[in-house]
Amino acid sequence: MGRKWNNIKEKKASKDKNTSRVYAKFGREIYVAAKQGEPDPESNQALKVVLERAKTYSVPRAIVDRAIEKAKGGAEENFDVLRYEGFGPSGSMVIVETLTNNVNRTASDVRAAFGKNGGNMGVSGSVAYMFDATAIFAFEGKTADDILELMMEADIDVRDILEEEESVIIYAEPEQFHAVQETLKEAGITDFSVAELVMLAQNEVTLSDEDVQQFEKMIDALEDLEDVQQVYHNVEL
């Protein structure tokens, strides 16, 4: 899973350079999670997970508070959680996760981003079966053996624990996100370089240099869309 970890790390580094866009996307996601349940993360698991993820991107407290207050205030802005699937150059596969208050606009924008950059939007299920929903954590200061022992003591059977570039990486089931993180926190691990819920490709493909350029242009076009929250793919970059 080393290459997959590198892809996630590079994607996060790229996002870190676009902080205002990242903050806006998290603001929307926090608002939706708070509005769909209780605005208190202690009683709203979905909100708690979003807030933990937001911490790894250093989302300012003011943005978090504003989104939660907006949800508390009974704002009538409603968003749909929609997934689009498609293909890029040479059969590469892409999943696009969105939060939208205008389904027609979002579908049109996503289709255009694919079509104008050598790709095409597929039907629901055409790509997702080649990805696994995964919780991933990365942090420093421990060894893989330390963490394996910790997880065993907590009776949490994660998918994999690796060591790379001074980081320990944990791959777990999505529903284990909270249990894994709480176990790590109880052991004094509170600084995560990555704490994410992602769609992880089961297999990665390698593209030609020319196709990589076109593929990256397509991914940039998708990620630039206001309604797009996450873009996942199976290309080794």
Swiss-Prot record:
Chief location category: cytoplasm
Keywords: Cytoplasm, DNA-binding, Transcription, Transcription regulation
Any GO BP: regulation of DNA-templated transcription
Cellular localization per UniProt: Cytoplasm
Top-level taxon: Bacteria
Classification via InterPro entries: Integrase-like_N (IPR017856), TACO1_YebC-like_2nd/3rd_dom (IPR048300), TACO1_YebC_N (IPR049083), Transcrip_reg_TACO1-like (IPR002876), Transcrip_reg_TACO1-like_dom3 (IPR026564), Transcrip_reg_TACO1_YeeN (IPR026562), YebC-like (IPR029072)
Keyword Transmembrane applies: no
Annotated Gene Ontology cellular component terms: cytosol
GO MF, any single term: DNA binding
Family the UniProt entry places it in: Belongs to the TACO1 family. YeeN subfamily.
Protein name (record): Probable transcriptional regulatory protein Exig_1693
Organism: Exiguobacterium sibiricum (strain DSM 17290 / CCUG 55495 / CIP 109462 / JCM 13490 / 255-15)
